[in-house]
Swiss-Prot record:
InterPro entries tied to this protein: ATP_synth_OSCP/delta_N_sf, ATPase_OSCP/dsu
Identification of the protein by name: ATP synthase subunit delta
Main location: membrane
The organism's taxonomic lineage, starting at the top: Bacteria, Pseudomonadati, Pseudomonadota, Gammaproteobacteria, Pseudomonadales
Location of this chain's protein in the cell: Cell inner membrane
Native source organism of the sequence: Pseudomonas syringae pv. tomato (strain ATCC BAA-871 / DC3000)
Amino acid sequence: MAELTTLARPYAKAAFEHAQAHQQLANWSAMLGLAAAVSQDDTMQRMLKAPRVTSAQKATTFIEVCGEKFDAKAQNFIHVVAENDRLPLLPEIAELFDLYKAEQEKSVDVDVTSAFALNQEQQDKLAKVLSARLGREVRLHAAEDASLIGGVVIRAGDLVIDGSVRGKIAKLAEALKS
């Protein structure tokens, strides 16, 4: 994964810098998201791996599949990525682009997993507290996992806060073992 990220980084950075300079971050994010989804299609993956298909043919086919969703600059970007045989890296490129975009917008995606469904009021309160703690706008994504028994697990980038009963039991069990 780290190697793929290293290979994808220059493309993501170039796309981000272009999109930022032209105030098109949302458009490019959507375009790269579509490109990532198309590149993960089984039929498209077979075509991308086919040794007899040239990079120009791969780019042209890719652009045709995406239709009018790509402007001229985006099509050129796909051609450059294809020339360097990096179309399979589009999911990583899109992910890095979105990280750069979030950093620019001072926002962060936060995944909150709870044992029981959180109502909208609880989600809003949690988002407000996390926003104050992280110093960023928080986009909250809530999920349920009954195996937590109670409490929540919060993931925001590299930060993980495990306030679940399952996590506390695991820590207690580890302490008893040592």
